[in-house]
């Protein structure tokens, strides 16, 4: 397995004093790195498309040789992920879509786990968020910490960014040898 082979995506709701907001994520399965995320006040297709676009941008700005061709994007069967606009966005990016079975949370277990960590480590620790802007600021801070400092047992107790860096170092060393 390698980075940019398989991604998972989903979103969750978060209560604020201004009403519900929805936070969506896109995670690289290999490294557990959150590549894209977004907070919006509605759970429409633009929410998940913007996360897909952010994940692509994250890779394109840091990986000279990045291509989305052959990448698999897995999500649940929610209407946002099965919409024509989203499937066209996947196709236009060269990404293969994968949809889980209806009502099976285990089908997207890695994403459910990441959302569980988000809820436990950020949302549940906050008494209340004033609105979308505060939730967005706090989420940005949490995502940075999650990607650069949080240790993950599944990847050798390393943060996702470090784990990806090790992969790329090993790949370069193998190419030189």
Segments predicted by a language model, with ranges:
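Charged DNA-binding/catalytic regions of mobile-element recombinases
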Residues: 1-177
């Amino acid at each position: 397995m390698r980075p940019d082979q398989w991604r998972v995506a989903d979103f969750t709701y978060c209560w604020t004093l201004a009403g519900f907001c929805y936070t969506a994520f896109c995670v690289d399965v290999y490294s557990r790195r959150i590549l894209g995320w977004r907070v919006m006040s509605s759970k429409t297709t633009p929410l998940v498309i913007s996360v897909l676009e952010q994940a692509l941008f994250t890779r394109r700005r840091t990986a000279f040789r990045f291509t989305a061709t052959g990448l698999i994007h897995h999500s649940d069967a929610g209407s946002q992920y099965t919409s024509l606009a989203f499937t066209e966005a996947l196709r236009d990016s060269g990404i293969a879509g994968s949809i889980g079975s209806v009502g099976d949370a285990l089908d997207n277990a890695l994403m459910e786990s990441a959302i569980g960590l988000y809820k436990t480590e950020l949302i549940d620790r906050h008494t209340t968020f004033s609105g979308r802007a505060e939730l967005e600021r706090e989420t940005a801070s949490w995502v940075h910490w999650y990607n650069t400092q949080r240790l993950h047992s599944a990847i050798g107790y390393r943060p996702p960014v470090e784990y990806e860096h090790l992969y790329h170092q090993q790949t370069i060393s193998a190419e030189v040898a």
